[in-house]
Amino acid sequence: MRLILLGAPGAGKGTQANYIREKFGIPQISTGDMLRAAVKAGTPLGLEAKAIMDAGGLVRDDIIIGLVKERIAQDDCANGFLFDGFPRTIPQAEAMIAAGVDIDYVVEIDVPDAAIVERMAGRRVHLASGRTYHVTFNPPKAAGKDDVTGEDLVQRDDDKEETVKKRLAVYHEQTAVLVGFYGKLAESGSAKAPKYVKIDGTRAVETVRDDVLKALGA
């Protein structure tokens, strides 16, 4: 099972990725984790990536693809893998195909922007304990206060509406185009084309999970 999970920040990809990992016994691979592991291991690609990052640059696609090929050759990928947050752009997707990295499924968790803003901007956190609330979906007993300690809840900077909207804008500009790319690839009928699956992510987590696993033949 080799798949790519797509979806905007806040669409619930992380939760669904955990279900998929557990069901199929495959690792979840993110470019950030790959880069950190390669830098730590001191591999040639890792050292090259570190030099670029230390200079404040963006790691080139050819290095990323090289790291991907190294990573998926490891033993824990024998049954497949789940790419989270990769590829981010069409050039990366094309480079992956050119490098012979085959994918079985592309799964998009689809949630409208307005629903994501409501989800994320409504989050409140008790920093000391990590307890999380939502002003609409999981409100504290007393507005703005932690249920256990009575201490103030805060809104993380990442959850502020303007920040969420900026992240969504970046997603639509860079990554959402992949949805169209993989959709067309699936329609092309090419033997190498992955199956493209779009799942409504606005429903209960368990319902989304069941639909995802069903689409993957589980």
From Swiss-Prot:
Residue segments, region NMP: 30-59
Listed Pfam families: ADK, ADK_lid
Subcellular compartments: Cytoplasm
Keywords: ATP-binding, Cytoplasm, Kinase, Nucleotide biosynthesis, Nucleotide-binding, Transferase
GO MF terms held by the record: adenylate kinase activity; ATP binding
Catalytic activity: AMP + ATP = 2 ADP
Annotated binding of ATP, by residue: 10-15, 123, 132-133, 203
Signal peptide as annotated in the record: none
Biological process, per Gene Ontology: AMP salvage
EC number: 2.7.4.3
InterPro entries named in the record: Adenyl_kin_sub, Adenylat/UMP-CMP_kin, Adenylat_kinase_CS, Adenylate_kinase_lid-dom, P-loop_NTPase
Top EC class of this enzyme: transferase
Function, as annotated: Catalyzes the reversible transfer of the terminal phosphate group between ATP and AMP. Plays an important role in cellular energy homeostasis and in adenine nucleotide metabolism.
Similarity field: Belongs to the adenylate kinase family.
Record note on domains: Consists of three domains, a large central CORE domain and two small peripheral domains, NMPbind and LID, which undergo movements during catalysis. The LID domain closes over the site of phosphoryl transfer upon ATP binding. Assembling and dissambling the active center during each catalytic cycle provides an effective means to prevent ATP hydrolysis.
SUBUNIT field: Monomer.
HAMAP family: Adenylate_kinase_Adk
Descriptive protein name: Adenylate kinase
Origin species: Chromobacterium violaceum (strain ATCC 12472 / DSM 30191 / JCM 1249 / CCUG 213 / NBRC 12614 / NCIMB 9131 / NCTC 9757 / MK)
Gene (UniProt): adk
